[in-house]
Amino acid sequence: RRLGANVAASAGSDLGLAAAGVRLDIVGEENAWAERPAVFLFNHQSQLDVFVLGAVLRKDFTGVAKKELEYNPMFGPIGYLADVAYIDRSNNARAREELQPVVDALKAGRSIAIAPEGTRSPTARLLPFKKGPFHMAMQAGVPVVPIVMRNCGEIMAAHSYVIHPGVVDVAVLPPVSTKGW
């Protein structure tokens, strides 16, 4: 199953982006490989983010998503293959419990991609960050790696299934150690 997830993340993302006419301009790609496992933090703009992350991170990672996506016909099967952790955002206590397997996955060597805002931002401005991603990184003793994406929301609007051709600018920033936090 992990091999299938790795192939789907890398080749599937590459093919999907190419077929849609989306090109990535990546700065700092070496930072995606500098320290693994890691908690990759990205600004969430649209469903296109999933494909961009797959093309950048390529293998041995999973994600965290809202519970409502577990049975989504487009995202659900991908999430199942990738062992995505689904979080009930309406119940903080349950959400914390649901994050424990994510910490275990980090300790076992698998990276996590998560939007620290907890939702899509309707504009290019960042929303306030949730604490969960940082707690997971600290508990697992792994670094956080910020990934900044630009143009995803313009190329594929929120709640849309239409992808327009274009260029997504991606900056993978250096890993930030959580030791001593």
Where are these regions (language model features)?
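Short glycine-rich anion-binding loops that position phosphate/pyrophosphate groups of nucleotides
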Residues: H44-Q47, E117-S121
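Anionic-ligand binding region
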Residues: R94-V103
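A cross-family acyltransferase "interaction/gating" segment
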Residues: M74-P77, E98, K107-A113, P122-W181
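Generic preference for hydrophobic
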Residues: I26, F40, G63, V170-V172
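Thr-Gly-centered strand-to-loop micro-motif
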Residues: V27, V64-K66, D88-R89, P116, ...
